[in-house]
């Protein structure tokens, strides 16, 4: 259906009938990652179990996708809907192994939120891994993430393998340093 109002805008609604996808059993996360050049056996999924990750993402659909992905890997998550919320949540609880930070959000963007966390003086503010999770994939975007104080730059749509290896690398190191 299509609807349009002068000086108000247009709305378009499309309905498509698709069969429901099969659920992936919780213990079968490796098959969820199948495909690509990396064999499933090489994915360090065990490193992710029990990690605490702060997901900073304003888009509800993106939240749903990343939270479900992380849940399949046994990752505990907390959500912040914008950069200001992320700074506030970190001020309340610094016990995160990784922060996955979208960069383009309302209220406060991810670059500014990262700078605020890094400069906060809170425990682990300089060492907690902050990984950009963004659609910004142009030349210079990765450098901008690093300049803001982020440790890595993951582009959307998120590649499951890259996410797993990044969380294994950064989250495992953060856990070792906290103990």
Task: Put a short name on every predicted segment.
Residues 1-179:
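C-terminal compact regulatory domains
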């Amino acid at each position: 259906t299509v609807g349009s109002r002068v000086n108000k805008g247009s709305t378009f609604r499309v309905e498509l009938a698709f069969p429901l996808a099969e659920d992936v059993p919780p213990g079968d996360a490796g098959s969820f990652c199948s495909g690509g050049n990396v064999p499933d056996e090489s994915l360090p999924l065990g490193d992710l179990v029990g990690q605490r990750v702060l997901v900073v993402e304003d888009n509800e659909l993106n939240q749903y996708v990343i939270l479900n992905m992380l849940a399949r890997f046994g990752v505990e998550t907390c959500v912040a809907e914008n950069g200001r919320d992320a700074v506030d949540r970190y001020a309340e609880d610094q016990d995160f192994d990784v922060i996955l930070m979208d960069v383009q959000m309302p209220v406060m963007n991810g670059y500014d939120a990262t700078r605020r966390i890094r400069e906060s003086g809170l425990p682990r503010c300089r060492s907690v891994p902050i990984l950009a999770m963004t659609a910004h994939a142009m030349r210079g975007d990765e450098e901008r993430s690093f300049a803001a104080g982020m440790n890595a730059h993951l582009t959307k749509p998120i590649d499951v393998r890259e996410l797993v290896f990044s969380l294994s690398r950064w989250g495992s190191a953060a856990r070792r340093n906290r103990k």
